[in-house]
UniProtKB/Swiss-Prot annotation:
Sites bearing N-acetylalanine, chain numbering: 2
Localization: Nucleus; Nucleus speckle
Subunit relationships: Component of the THO subcomplex, which is composed of THOC1, THOC2, THOC3, THOC5, THOC6 and THOC7. The THO subcomplex interacts with DDX39B to form the THO-DDX39B complex which multimerizes into a 28-subunit tetrameric assembly. Component of the transcription/export (TREX) complex at least composed of ALYREF/THOC4, DDX39B, SARNP/CIP29, CHTOP and the THO subcomplex; in the complex interacts with THOC2. TREX seems to have a dynamic structure involving ATP-dependent remodeling.
Protein's gene: THOC3
Organism, as annotated: Bos taurus (Bovine)
Region (Disordered): 1-22
Family: Belongs to the THOC3 family.
Keywords carried by this UniProt record: Acetylation, mRNA processing, mRNA splicing, mRNA transport, Nucleus, Repeat, RNA-binding, Transport, WD repeat
A GO-annotated cellular component: THO complex part of transcription export complex
Known function: Component of the THO subcomplex of the TREX complex which is thought to couple mRNA transcription, processing and nuclear export, and which specifically associates with spliced mRNA and not with unspliced pre-mRNA. Required for efficient export of polyadenylated RNA and spliced mRNA. The THOC1-THOC2-THOC3 core complex alone is sufficient to bind export factor NXF1-NXT1 and promote ATPase activity of DDX39B.
Protein name: THO complex subunit 3
Length: 351
């Protein structure tokens, strides 16, 4: 696919134009009032609690749009849904039906009762928590590893291991379009306006397509190595990418320039999540902590200690609560104890 190349992101300091580092990048002079306020909050709410969810490692966690439920997808071929009751997660149901690992899941953007799972069994399944049943199974051409729901709720995009992205009508459950890419496709996402579709790829690029036309708009050389994950901030101002170079880069949605880099992790960045107000960014990797940064300055706001690599993080859509899931613990005796747990950070220390 011939897409015009933009200039390099984090390593192109001083350049301007789409895809470059903004020249106004500056180092913060001290903690902002927001950072100090959130640090004060987390000093009293720094507890992390574990909740049994699955019989094998958890690949994906996501909150419903109203924040009442958390869903998790696992290597054990199931999805679990929890209700958030005050300061704990109560398991509501386990969803069976997939014949292989559930690699990613997401909720409908505005209907808190529907979520969709992507599996290595070459299907996606749409589930309704009201009936606890699968309302649709859609067969796809390959083993599915990435999935997202369009902001208008009308389309589900699913990416497979063969770098094919299929666009599925959320009402008819039929394929509307299919794109085969000539590069390794990692995470996929619409922008908040629903008129562009973003892909991160194995060459360190962000590929941007118009939507629904799926015509190439731009390719940004975002990182010198594999660009793994992408998330849009709920305010629509920024998006962030995480890379195998251990950097998180923050991009201006309108200008497509890199405005900031976060470099406290040492391992490839696997997962990202913006807080509900767009002011905090959580990023995680094989490092044994989750970095929580203030978006506007890049300053470290907090770090959540982990005992193993983190696969997935998700901020609650209304509260400063962070759900996450880690790899199984190392060691013969510890590994089975933590396999399949979902964790929640931000709980009161005395809870």
């Amino acid at each position: 696919m011939a897409i015009p190349q933009a200039s390099m992101g984090p390593s192109s300091l001083g350049q301007s134009g789409p895809g470059s580092m903004a020249p106004w990048c500056s180092v913060s002079s001290g903690p902002t009032r927001y950072v100090l306020g959130m640090q004060e909050l987390f000093r009293g709410h720094s507890k992390t609690r574990e909740f049994p969810a699955h019989s094998a490692k958890v690949h994906s966690v996501a909150w419903s749009c109203d924040g009442r439920r958390l869903a998790s997808g696992s290597f054990d071929k199931t999805a679990s849904v929890f209700l958030l009751e005050k300061d704990r997660l109560v398991k509501e149901n386990n969803y069976r039906g997939h014949g292989d690992s559930v690699d990613q899941l997401c909720w409908h953007p505005s209907n808190p009762d529907l979520f969709v799972t992507a599996s290595g069994d070459k299907t996606i399944r749409i589930w309704d928590v009201r009936t606890t049943k699968c309302i649709a199974t859609v067969n796809t051409k390959g083993e599915n590893i990435n999935i997202c729901w369009s902001p208008d709720g009308q389309t589900i995009a699913v990416g497979n291991k063969d770098d094919v992205v299929t666009f599925i009508d959320a009402k008819t459950h039929r394929s509307k379009a299919e794109e085969q890419f000539k590069f390794e496709v990692n995470e996929i996402s619409w922008n908040n306006d629903n008129n562009m579709f973003f892909l991160t790829n194995g060459n360190g690029c962000i590929n941007i397509l118009s939507y629904p036309e799926l015509k190439p708009v731009q390719s940004i050389n975002a990182h010198p190595s594999n660009c793994i994950c992408i998330k849009f901030d709920p305010m629509g101002k920024y998006f962030a990418t995480g890379s195998a170079d251990a950097l998180v880069s923050l991009w201006d949605v309108d200008e497509l320039v890199c405005v900031r880099c976060f470099s406290r992790l040492d391992w490839p960045v696997r997962t990202l999540s913006f807080s509900h107000d767009g002011k905090m960014l959580a990023s995680a990797s094989e490092d044994h902590f989750i970095d929580i940064a203030e978006v506007e300055t890049g300053d470290k706001l907090w770090e959540v200690q982990c005992e193993s690599p983190t696969f997935t993080v998700a901020w609650h859509p209304k509260r400063p609560l962070l759900a996450f899931a880690c790899d199984d613990k190392d060691g013969k005796y510890d590994s089975s104890r933590e396999a399949g747990t979902v964790k929640l950070f931000g709980l009161p220390n005395d809870s």
